UniProtKB/Swiss-Prot annotation:
Pathway(s) it belongs to: Amino-acid biosynthesis; L-proline biosynthesis; L-proline from L-glutamate 5-semialdehyde: step 1/1
Gene: pro3
Keywords: Amino-acid biosynthesis, NADP, Oxidoreductase, Proline biosynthesis
GO CC annotation terms, alphabetical: cytosol
InterPro entries reported for this sequence: 6-PGluconate_DH-like_C_sf, NAD(P)-bd_dom_sf, P5C_Rdtase_cat_N, P5CR-like_CS, P5CR_dimer, Pyrroline-COOH_reductase
One BP term from GO: L-proline biosynthetic process
Range of residues in the leader sequence: none
Claim: Amino-acid biosynthesis is one of the keywords in the record: yes
One example GO MF annotation: pyrroline-5-carboxylate reductase activity
E.C. code: 1.5.1.2
Reaction it catalyzes: L-proline + NADP(+) = (S)-1-pyrroline-5-carboxylate + NADPH + 2 H(+); L-proline + NAD(+) = (S)-1-pyrroline-5-carboxylate + NADH + 2 H(+)
Name by which UniProt lists this protein: Pyrroline-5-carboxylate reductase
TM annotation in the entry: none
Amino acid sequence: MSGFCVLGCGTMGKALLTGIFDSIAENGNDVSDEIIIPNKFYACVKFPKEKEDVQKLFGDRVKVVMGAKENAEMAAISNVLLLSCKPQAAEDVLNSPKMKEALKGKLILSILAGKTISSLQSMLDESTRVIRIMPNTASRIRESMSVICPGPNATEEDIKFAEWVFNGIGRSMKLPEKLIDAATAVCGSGPAFVATMIEAMTDGGVMMGIPFPQAQELAAQTMVGTGRMVLQGQHPAMIRNDVSTPAGCTISGLLALEDGKIRSTIARGIEQATKTASGLGK
């Protein structure tokens, strides 16, 4: 038996459980022998309304509990725990009675913003393994870009399991923890930056006579399609050059964007967001 427990089953916890169940339904046991697929699922919540919502969503596939005593009991019978409570509640959750003992030798997948591996490890037994992960808001539609940062005592099997879990809600990439602030800026804050670009393209279309709903769909699908071409191996510069014919409308528009310093403005936005992210955990 392999148990998977979600400590704090809010929006992200529910998205990850949904991804796990969908992955199991789609692929069954057709995964690497190094990955032990959970067959028991538990969710720990704080309020009755949360318990009702999780139970309604997953039915008898997930056992939902409330209270520190119950949290520790579920942790004790689980092999892997997803730490997805509010970051400021982490200390109370991990230092609650019997929890430290229950987590000995277990794997913790933490998605807590600003909580470093070392800060979490200081609250846990040295035998507890920690992997820090940063998913993004697109996890809601299983299109997340998640960054996986293994702790020093995480095993290869632990990392493969984390990748399996987070690939269920999109894509994942392993990076050292020292790069997580930059990754937070690119793919954590990135949806807000991309949404702003979609808004700007939409506004331009409306300005030139396209009704708003159609302009927004045109802009959004163009962003999605271009992203998929890049993910399939096409370099952004090649895509740009392929569309830019001599004396054409594309190169004319690109020059106007370059006049507005679009490249350096976006790059500086990433730089500033990285600096801000680095201060969140201090």
